[in-house]
Amino acid sequence: MPCYCLPGGLQNRAYCIVTSNKQHMVISDSRFVPPQQEGGKADIVETITAANTLQAKRLFVTARNRLFDIARWGNISEGISASFQLADKNGHIKNGLPQVGDHIRINVPGPGSSAGAGYDWVRIEIVQEANEPDKEFAVIKVRPSAAPEKQKGTAHFFDSAATSSFIVNREGRHISAEIHGRNEKPNMETEKVTDQIRNFVVGAAATEGFAKIQWQKLAKGILKVQTTRS
């Protein structure tokens, strides 16, 4: 069995960790993951199991910090093709923790959305954390939105009924990174025909599995630990 070293200066100690991509939803609260009603959906779940609770808590903190460091999602996700930037309600790039009302600016390969000045945009609707002795979680829920400077329309290849929920969860020794997409349909309610064509092509590719591949890379990156052999 492979052994992994905890990041953050603990490379002198090896801990055995079991990895898995068992597809079950750990978080089922409809506030965080809305009901599926129409269009496509995605459920990505990656899990690791720590040797003990102390190690699990440390791994959770690392994963939680990666979840909230949105600008580095592309850096921690091997092979992901999109890039992400956290922006405030006015569209200005910002550092620090995400807040409700902030936006995420997404740069998808290929032609960009003219409605979003070349980018796709989502607005953060929920940022929530909970910490209990044997259970912890952190959640970011987003929805396609207008570009901040326009405040109308939807500058995204999915329409505004879609949501994406990004979750890090710990129960005992088990830590999961989850990404749940709901009600994903191409955004055809745009002013320009070129945007409609682009959104149909990109949105269809996303619902057919391309987005799932990208999100799985992000989930793996959030949970990634450095490996050594004992």
Question: Where do the language-model regions lie?
Answer:
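Mixed-charge, low-complexity intrinsically disordered regions
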Residues: 3-5, 15-103, 109-116, 153-230
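Residue-identity detector for glycine
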Residues: 8-9
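Short beta-strand-centered aromatic/proline hotspots
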Residues: 117-129
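Short, solvent-exposed secondary-structure boundary/capping segments
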Residues: 128-145
